[in-house]
Amino acid sequence: KVWREPDAAAGIAWLQYIYWIKYGDKKYLNATRQCMAFLQNRPQKEGTFYEIMMPYGAYLAVRMNAELGTTYDELKMLNWCFDGNNSDRDGWGVMCERWNKYDVHGLVGQKKDEQYAFAMNTFSQAAALVPIVKYNPAYASTIGKWMLNLANACRLFYADEHPRNRQSSSIWEGDPQHVICYEGLRKDLYHGNHFEPFQGLLLSLIHI
């Protein structure tokens, strides 16, 4: 099986666009267009979101449409960042549910099989997509609603929101003010976990 991370095109496109802005060399803009063409020509059903880079491609689609008059399919690329329907990593997107009594709407991670949300993926996606409202204010209401949910749910990455028996590193005493977040949040330790040696304990994890 060939390992594929198609949203690498989004990450490279963003880098090349920033280089073009900084240095003015058209070769960087041409490289950006080549990467964006790959995303533009990919069918909607073949979502590209692998883990962290696709939001930068969606951001760039909105920005280039505003700055250069291109006609990239913004909604297609934005939906890839949220809906979890991806050809090479199905389920990676934004949570839209409650886990037991906890509201996890807005967090980013594996929303289907493992049901595993990650702190840095959540923070990174917010950083990439919030700025699109500068280039297309029509997204302001939707992005604002997502950010309200995200900000509310992000507290669940921190130890003081959970009893010790739901934390993988509750014995660590180096952060008495609870300002360092856990890496991830899982619906439970067994849901979608096919690796028996790790059942019952995963590093840097809170389970609900």
Feature map (PLM): residue ranges:
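Extracytoplasmic catalytic/substrate-binding loops of multi-pass membrane glycan-assembly enzymes
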Residues: 8, 50-51
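Phenylalanine-focused residue identity feature
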Residues: 38, 49, 59, 82, ...
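Carbohydrate-binding/catalytic loop surfaces
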Residues: 1-3, 53-72, 94-118, 163-203
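Long, well-ordered core segments of solenoidal/helical folds
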Residues: 1, 21, 25-47, 72-107, ...
